[in-house]
Amino acid sequence: MTNSLFKQKLSPIKPGDPIDYKDVELLKKFITDRGKILPRRLTGLTAKQQRDLTTAVKRARIIALLPFVNPEG
């Protein structure tokens, strides 16, 4: 297997920018149509950004800004 299978994606979030759980439109970019959080190798985020993103998505789900699962999926 070569590294050509995965294209390097540029992160839409600049390093150092905060990831806010209230920014639902940004969080939706990192969630599949079934409601799962995309892995870091697909999002192009740094490890810290991916951890912050996961925390933000989970917080948004708990306060009902994002669904836990997609109703159509």
From Swiss-Prot:
Protein's name according to its UniProt entry: Small ribosomal subunit protein bS18
Entry keyword annotation includes Kinase: no
Species this chain originates from: Prochlorococcus marinus (strain NATL2A)
Alphabetical list of HAMAP family matching this protein: Ribosomal_bS18
Record SUPFAM superfamilies: Ribosomal protein S18
GO CC annotations, alphabetized: cytosolic small ribosomal subunit
Keyword rRNA-binding (UniProt): yes
Keywords (A to Z) from UniProt: Ribonucleoprotein, Ribosomal protein, RNA-binding, rRNA-binding
GO process terms (BP): translation
One MF term in the entry's GO annotations: small ribosomal subunit rRNA binding
Gene3D superfamilies: Ribosomal protein S18
Family the entry assigns: Belongs to the bacterial ribosomal protein bS18 family.
Coiled-coil annotated residue ranges, if any: none
Complexes and interactors: Part of the 30S ribosomal subunit. Forms a tight heterodimer with protein bS6.
InterPro entries reported in the protein's UniProt record: Ribosomal_bS18 (IPR001648), Ribosomal_bS18_CS (IPR018275), Ribosomal_bS18_sf (IPR036870)
